[in-house]
Amino acid sequence: MGLQEEFEEFAEKAKTLPDTISNEDKLLLYGLYKQATVGPVTTGRPGIFNLKDRYKWDAWKAVEGKSKEEAMADYITKVKQLLEEASASTS
């Protein structure tokens, strides 16, 4: 299985993560996903009154230097970690 296919598989698995994962982890996954699928952020930072989009933009900007392949690999690693943690907490 190639990196792209594995990334797509884990993007689907990420949808099954419990709601209890931290906002920090959710934002990290968002940033890595956007970097992997779109590339570097090209839009301006949302205004102060649009906090949700501002946090998401910041998360994407934080991983700006990564290649798409690096972002995919980091995304897969993080989803695996979160799935293992979720599995351990329900055992």
Swiss-Prot record:
Primary localisation category: cytoplasm
Write out the tissue specificity statement of the associated record: Highly expressed in leaves. Expressed at low levels in roots and seeds.
Give the protein name, as stated in the record.
Acyl-CoA-binding domain-containing protein 2
- Where is this protein localized, as stated in its record? Cytoplasm, Cytosol
Q: What does the function comment of this entry state?
A: Binds medium- and long-chain acyl-CoA esters with high affinity. Can interact in vitro with linolenoyl-CoA. Binds palmitoyl-CoA and linoleoyl-CoA in vitro. Binds phosphatidic acid (PA) and phosphatidylcholine (PC) in vitro. May play a role in the biosynthesis of phospholipids.
Keywords, A to Z, come to: Cytoplasm, Lipid-binding
Please name the GO terms that the record assigns under molecular function. fatty-acyl-CoA binding
Domain ACB: start-end pairs? 3-88
Coiled-coil regions listed in the entry: none
Q: Name one GO biological process term.
A: fatty acid metabolic process
* Source species: Oryza sativa subsp. japonica (Rice)
What gene does this protein come from? ACBP2
Top-level taxon in the UniProt lineage: Eukaryota
- Kindly summarize what the UniProt induction comment says about this protein's expression: Down-regulated by cold stress, wounding and infection with the rice blast fungus Magnaporthe oryzae.
